[in-house]
Amino acid sequence: MNLENVLCQINAYHCILHLPSFRAVVSSNDHSGTLRCRAGRTATTPSPFDRAFLFGEGIYEVCLLVNGRFVDMDSHLARLDRSLAACGMTPPPERPQLERIINDLARRNGVTNGLAYLQVTPGATPRSFTAVPQDRATLFILTQAQDFLSAPHLSRGITVQVRPDIRWLHRDIKTIMLLPQVMAKRSALANGFDDTIFVDEQGITEGSSSNIFIVTDAGTLVTRPLSDHLLAGCTRQRIITLARDAGMTVEERIITRDELSRAPEVFATSATYLVVPITRIDDHVVGDGGIGTVTRRLQDAYIAFIRALAATGAP
């Protein structure tokens, strides 16, 4: 099934797809679903009254692509569904159809290593907090080429600052409202760090775009339990599964600020970070300043998992 045919089957969405030399859009005004493509320009754009523009209302996902295979796509799309349901937003196309669109877009763009970004927004309304969208929702997808498995930070590690978590209290919803995260990352760079770890009144919540793990002196892997205080990371869950399969002890509990400072190993996980060692926290060097034994073991296990998946080739 080619991309044009897939798009024409979707009646509830604009499908805005970033391609190398043009953007393809199914026009909301053309109910026949005709695909309009114009080199170097956009045939139809989302309305400036889309609630994503006016209120930051929308949900997104980022999925890693290696050798034409998306990693844990089922988990990412399941989380997308949960986030949309939590916000009362229109669900995306049926899972098999959405997967075909994403895979076809990656092929058309010639992207075999990189990521796919999906964003769902409610559509256009008058500027009112309570207005109910009457137009189609907007589904935006792009692919981006990048070799995340060769990223220097995988061996070099990253440095982080710790800052109060000022975000809202439904961090389990993967919303496009990312201003606190943007501010945290900019603050980190301005202060000579790579990233930020957030802390609330209980302890460590998560990184600005990652989940956080520590390794205790006894070799136990610890990460904060899932709640509305943090995102249910797909890579986080994969690492927990790989660790337990390898016979490691894993605890999901609160990590205090003091425990974070004393941990011999700390690392972050995300779709694009993979498993990245944290070598310095504020002015404190973690362990010997390099990648720890447990961190290396889990990083190797995760990359091996990805490579085994990628060896099967594009679907």
Where are the regions a protein language model picked out?
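Ordered, amphipathic secondary-structure segments that act as subunit-interaction surfaces
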Residues: 111-120
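Compositionally biased, low-complexity intrinsically disordered regions
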Residues: 1, 5, 20-21
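Helix-start/capping segments and mature chain N-termini
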Residues: 26-104, 121, 130-315
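Short terminal hydrophobic/aromatic SLiMs and anchors at protein ends
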Residues: 14-15, 31
